[in-house]
């Protein structure tokens, strides 16, 4: 079950591969995500050394968040993956012109996980072509309903 989706990522990128990654979160962040107060539309993923981080993910703290903890809604959060997966992703990002984008946040066995995608950017004509295909599929469905 998805908590938050990044539909903009599917519009702007061709998603080649998907990976599930854990997130290093603080307690107040988990509570806020469970309440649906997170946004990953502007988020992006970077590689620093042998580690992968997500930047720009905004988690709005709940009003009941502790007063003696400084809450930073857009702090850099580390992604948890196996070493072999990290090595494979780093290789593709550095060599093949791919980028990493967050696709969604979801639960897996009670934990908050992020689905990240290995993606290539779409050109403007690719986006227009996808929109034409989507419109044609809608029109076909509409015509089928009218005939039936």
Curated annotation (Swiss-Prot):
CDD domains: SmpB
Record carries keyword Acetylation: no
Gene3D superfamilies: 2.40.280.10
Gene Ontology biological-process entries: trans-translation
PROSITE patterns found in the cross-reference section: SSRP
Localization annotation: Cytoplasm
Function: Required for rescue of stalled ribosomes mediated by trans-translation. Binds to transfer-messenger RNA (tmRNA), required for stable association of tmRNA with ribosomes. tmRNA and SmpB together mimic tRNA shape, replacing the anticodon stem-loop with SmpB. tmRNA is encoded by the ssrA gene; the 2 termini fold to resemble tRNA(Ala) and it encodes a 'tag peptide', a short internal open reading frame. During trans-translation Ala-aminoacylated tmRNA acts like a tRNA, entering the A-site of stalled ribosomes, displacing the stalled mRNA.
Protein name per Swiss-Prot or TrEMBL: SsrA-binding protein
Provenance organism: Azoarcus sp. (strain BH72)
Protein encoded by which gene: smpB
């Amino acid at each position: 079950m998805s908590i938050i989706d990044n539909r903009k990522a599917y519009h702007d990128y061709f998603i080649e591969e998907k990976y599930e990654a854990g997130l290093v979160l603080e307690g107040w962040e988990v509570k806020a995500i469970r309440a649906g107060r997170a946004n990953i539309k502007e988020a992006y993923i970077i590689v620093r050394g042998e580690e992968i981080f997500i930047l720009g993910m905004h988690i709005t703290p709940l009003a009941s968040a502790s007063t003696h903890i400084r809450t930073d809604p857009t702090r850099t959060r580390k992604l948890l993956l196996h070493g072999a997966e990290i090595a494979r992703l780093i290789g593709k990002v550095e060599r093949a012109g791919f980028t990493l984008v967050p696709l969604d946040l979801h639960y897996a066995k009670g934990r908050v996980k992020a689905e990240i995608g290995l993606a290539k950017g779409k050109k403007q004509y690719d986006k227009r072509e996808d929109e034409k295909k989507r419109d044609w599929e809608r029109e076909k469905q509409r015509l089928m309903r009218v005939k039936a």
